[in-house]
């Protein structure tokens, strides 16, 4: 399901409505993003909204990731629990608030009434509270790809943790040199283009990641 929720804009009687499949993650929202070319929201950019039932203040920002054709065109941004939101957060220097424990329960960063709840139980309670306080707009059935863990068969929750990384960019210098010097050759040769595209865009390599 996808849920439509309205966020009140401070200092006015206006609301901005977002659509989300994971309403429980609103506990960790740090911005609302709209597309820079979306005229519907132009007047709202830079305004402050209050996260419903949470009470924390966040800003409406511009970012190209927001798709005017998807949902309402306005996105809640939760950098700690969504890969794309994390990238938006990095571009816009947003705060990162992790709201989950390693066992999928709500942690101490959320309002105390939700702390300790399982994420799906929290979803039910949050939706009820949003309806009771008239922040809930509607819900719709959708087809959505949901990732499951290979070992646990549980729904995967993006989650920030401390990890060890190898400097893959530094390692790639020698890896590129052996190809440019012809010490190593590709057959067929056109695969060298793919190799260099990978090497030239390589990122730090996580060497301590966990599989669930």
Regions found by a protein language model. Give the residues of each.
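Short histidine-centered catalytic/ligand-binding loop motif
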Residues: 111-119, 186-191
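NTP-handling and nucleic-acid-processing catalytic cores
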Residues: 1-103, 174-211
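Short acidic beta-strand-loop surface patches of small beta-rich interaction domains
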Residues: 104-109
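Active-site neighborhoods of enzyme catalytic cores
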Residues: 1-25, 114-122, 127, 134-168, ...
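Soluble, acidic/polar mature domains that operate outside membranes
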Residues: 170-172
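Short, surface-exposed, polar/charged, turn-prone segments marking secondary-structure boundaries
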Residues: 47, 127-128
């Amino acid at each position: 399901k996808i849920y439509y929720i309205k966020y009140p804009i401070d200092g006015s009687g206006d609301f901005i409505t977002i659509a989300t499949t994971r309403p429980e993650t609103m506990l960790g929202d740090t911005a609302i993003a709209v597309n820079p070319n979306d005229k519907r929201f132009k007047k709202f950019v830079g305004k402050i909204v209050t996260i419903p039932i949470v009470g924390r203040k966040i800003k409406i920002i511009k970012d190209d990731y927001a798709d005017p054709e998807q949902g309402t065109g306005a996105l809640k941004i939760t950098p700690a629990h969504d890969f794309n939101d994390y990238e938006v957060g990095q571009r816009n220097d947003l705060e990162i608030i992790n709201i989950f424990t390693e066992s999928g329960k709500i942690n101490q960063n959320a309002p105390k009434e939700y702390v300790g709840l399982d994420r799906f139980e929290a979803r039910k309670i949050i939706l009820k509270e949003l309806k009771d306080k008239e922040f809930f707009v509607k819900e719709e059935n959708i087809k959505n790809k949901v990732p499951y863990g290979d070992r646990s068969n549980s729904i995967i929750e993006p989650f920030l943790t401390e990890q060890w990384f190898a400097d893959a960019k530094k390692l790639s210098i020698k890896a590129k040199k052996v190809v440019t010097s012809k010490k190593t050759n590709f057959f067929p040769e056109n695969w060298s283009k793919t190799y260099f595209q990978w090497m030239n865009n390589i990122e730090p390599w996580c060497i301590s990641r966990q599989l669930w």
